[in-house]
From Swiss-Prot:
Reactions listed under catalytic activity: (S)-4-amino-5-oxopentanoate + tRNA(Glu) + NADP(+) = L-glutamyl-tRNA(Glu) + NADPH + H(+)
Family annotation (NCBIfam families): hemA (TIGR01035)
Family: Belongs to the glutamyl-tRNA reductase family.
EC number: 1.2.1.70
Protein's recorded name: Glutamyl-tRNA reductase
Gene: hemA
Length: 426
């Protein structure tokens, strides 16, 4: 009987506030995190996904181990009180874990249902895990299946038609506060994927002045040129606050980028013209105390959920269709997985029958001197056909729907191995 199982553990925007998520975000990169995961948990196969809205760990391991406790220690690493960890962490095993992964890949569990970023994030995480040898046959199959599920959902539903990214939700929030953005000056802090998406949406909304601040000036210039904007280094950031109206920050820094104490005197220079900050980074880039300054408005990634709700109703119908696809593909994967339990017995039964046929043919054919080669081949085909028909019922018995479930599979495997005297490990 299979003693290994698929487990999925995680925290996301639904279970855990950003103040906690930023403490456990793997800002040092996948290589460091995956190496730690292998050292501290040590599973047969493992995979880790870390985004602004979720951290999820997928493992294939011995089902008798207390994997949840081990993963919890790895994930929270003493940064969160132990009694709170249980409230934040979700733990799934077997089929529910598979269905959750497919749901995430299909963007049905995203803050913005239907957004396209999550699939790319899943694939990036997989490339790192695969390159480090963390994944194996089971997780490779499962993760590739999740990619195909996401593609099928995109193809067969309009889930992405009215979807917006987190970056676009930030732009929508800016419009809500300022109205027309044509005359507004915007500064992007960070030049990564989120910043680029924000720039695309801002230009689409009529913004004509974009400033990009980044630690790597070359990347800032590259992004600014793409949108007809201006690039600056991070040291010029505070000086630019005197002129801009909207700041969208999405760096990968592990510390606060813009401090409240530094902005206070700038507001006097601005004569208290409104300054709007949107922090879509995890860990957060912007000092939470900015909200205490007069005419300064700060929104973090969790606040964006209110903007996201505007488009939610238009996606509900397509989300139902997408959910049906996820359920169907989950069942298909389960059928394949259940088949792994009976496959060794199927092979053993066929090998035993083939061995019997070969043995009997070797004994019988030499005695039939009068038979020509054609007749001998006919006898061999006839015996093979009889064998195939004889095996049909027991093999069907093993693979039938009534065999689903590991306990039922194992009971039928044990029965057939006993009846046919099949030996060896399964």
């Amino acid at each position: 009987m299979f003693e290994k199982q698929v487990f999925l553990f995680g925290v996301n925007h639904k279970t855990t506030p950003v103040a906690v998520r930023e403490k456990i975000a793997f800002t040092d990169g996948y290589e460091t995190a995956l190496t730690r995961l292998q050292e501290e948990v040590g599973c047969d196969e493992s995979y880790l996904l870390s985004t602004c809205n979720r951290v999820e760990i997928l493992v294939y391991a011995d089902s008798t181990r207390d994997i949840e406790a081990e993963v919890s220690r790895f994930l929270f690493a003493g940064k969160v009180p132990e009694e709170d960890c249980r409230d934040y962490l979700y733990a799934l095993k077997g089929l529910p874990a598979v269905q959750h992964l497919f749901t995430v890949a299909a963007s049905l569990d995203s803050m913005v249902v239907g957004e396209a970023q999550i699939l790319g994030q899943l694939k990036t995480a997989y490339r790192h895990a695969s390159a480090l040898g963390c994944t194996g046959p089971l997780l490779n199959r499962l993760l590739h299946k999740s990619f195909s599920v996401a593609k099928r959902v995109r193809t067969e539903t309009a889930i992405g038609a009215s979807a917006v990214s987190i970056s676009y939700a930030a732009v929508q929030l800016a419009r809500k506060i300022f109205g027309n953005l044509d005359t507004k000056k915007v500064m992007l802090v960070g030049a990564g994927e989120m910043a680029e998406l924000a720039a695309e949406h801002l230009v689409g909304q009529g913004v004509s002045s974009v400033v990009v601040a980044n630690r790597t000036l070359t990347r800032a210039v590259e992004l600014a040129d793409k949108f007809g904007g201006t690039a600056i280094c991070m040291e010029e950031l505070y000086a630019q606050l005197e002129d801009v109206d909207i700041i969208i920050s999405s760096t990968g820094a592990q510390h606060i980028i813009i401090e409240s104490a530094e902005v206070r005197p700038i507001m006097r220079v601005r004569r208290n013209r409104p300054l709007f900050f949107i922090d879509i980074a995890v860990p957060r880039d912007l000092d939470p105390e900015l909200n205490e300054l007069e005419n300064v408005y700060l929104y973090d990634i969790d606040d964006l959920s209110n903007v996201v709700e505007v488009n939610k109703s238009g996606r509900d119908h397509e989300a139902i269709k997408a959910g049906c696809i996820v359920e169907e593909e989950t069942r298909k994967f389960d059928e394949w997985y259940q088949g792994l339990a009976v496959k060794p017995t199927v092979l053993a039964l066929r090998e035993k029958m083939s061995g019997i046929i070969e043995q009997e043919l070797r004994k019988t054919l030499p005695r039939l001197h009068d038979l020509g080669e054609h007749d001998q081949r006919s006898i061999e085909k006839m015996v093979a056909s009889i064998s195939s028909k004889f095996l049909h019922d027991p093999l069907h018995y093993l693979k039938s729907d009534s065999c689903h479930g590991r306990d039922k599979s194992q009971a039928k495997v044990d029965t057939l191995r006993s009846v046919f005297s099949l030996k060896g490990d399964i």
